[in-house]
Amino acid sequence: VILLLITSTPSVDARLKAKDNMPLASFHDNAKRTLQTRLINTRCCPGKPCCRIG
């Protein structure tokens, strides 16, 4: 009987999630992609006066 209960329970997603229930890995990928796009668009590096990001 116990084995039937264990197999019938819904699976648990063990990945870390952000506040809006979005997986953190996806959140970090989106942030990285956005930063790379902005660096390409501005053609500068963070820490330099020309850069609009940092």
Curated annotation (Swiss-Prot):
**Residue numbers bearing the Isoleucine amide modification:** 53
Specify whether Disulfide bond is a keyword of the entry. yes
For this record, the Gene Ontology CC terms, alphabetical, are:
extracellular region
Name the UniProt key words of this record, in alphabetical order: Amidation, Disulfide bond, Hydroxylation, Ion channel impairing toxin, Neurotoxin, Secreted, Signal, Toxin
Localization (cell): Secreted
Q: Which residues form the propeptide?
A: 15-42
Q: Identify the stretch annotated as signal peptide in this record.
A: 1-14
Which Pfam families does the entry mention?
Chi-conotoxin (PF16981)
- Which family is this sequence assigned to? Belongs to the conotoxin T superfamily.
Query: Which comment does the entry carry about domains?
Result: The cysteine framework is V (CC-CC).
Q: What is this protein called?
A: Conotoxin vc5a
